[in-house]
């Protein structure tokens, strides 16, 4: 645990859960982590390898978001996920995708079978800095 980023992620996680699951700890190894306004946790893959790893760590009740028209990250959202948190996570998926800023995109959120679709304009990454862990 010599990586200061990993240590900070563990501290942040333990402020929000009483007991960390194996999945919680495994997810700390991958992606960019955001604590969303409603308290849900979002993990944004940085590479294809991280996207693949994140996809294997989905639990019941989690959402997996992805931009439909452009390459980009998978965004895993877990915890008590509000509608607002899902909208913010859709913005994360768009901002970190290859879609040019200001481009209209569609983001699909998959919670184990029933999809939710968000249509938005690609925001800047700076919009999400307040929630970066």
Predicted features along the sequence, with ranges:
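Nucleotide-activated chemistry modules centered on ATP-dependent adenylation/adenylyltransferase
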Residues: 1-76, 82-83, 96-100
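RNA-binding accessory domains that recognize and position tRNA/RNA substrates
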Residues: 26, 33, 60, 68-73, ...
């Amino acid at each position: 645990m010599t990586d200061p980023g990993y240590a900070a992620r563990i501290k942040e996680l333990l402020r929000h859960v009483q007991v960390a699951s194996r999945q919680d700890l495994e997810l700390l190894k991958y992606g960019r982590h955001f604590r969303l306004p409603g308290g849900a946790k979002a993990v944004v893959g940085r590479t294809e390898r991280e996207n693949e790893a994140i996809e294997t760590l989905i639990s019941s009740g989690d959402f997996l978001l992805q931009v439909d028209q452009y390459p980009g990250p998978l965004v895993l959202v877990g915890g008590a996920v509000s509608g607002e948190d899902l909208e913010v996570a859709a913005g994360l998926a768009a901002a970190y995708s290859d879609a040019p800023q200001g481009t209209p995109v569609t983001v699909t959120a998959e919670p184990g079978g029933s999809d939710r679709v968000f249509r938005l304009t690609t925001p800047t990454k700076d919009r999400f800095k307040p929630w970066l862990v």
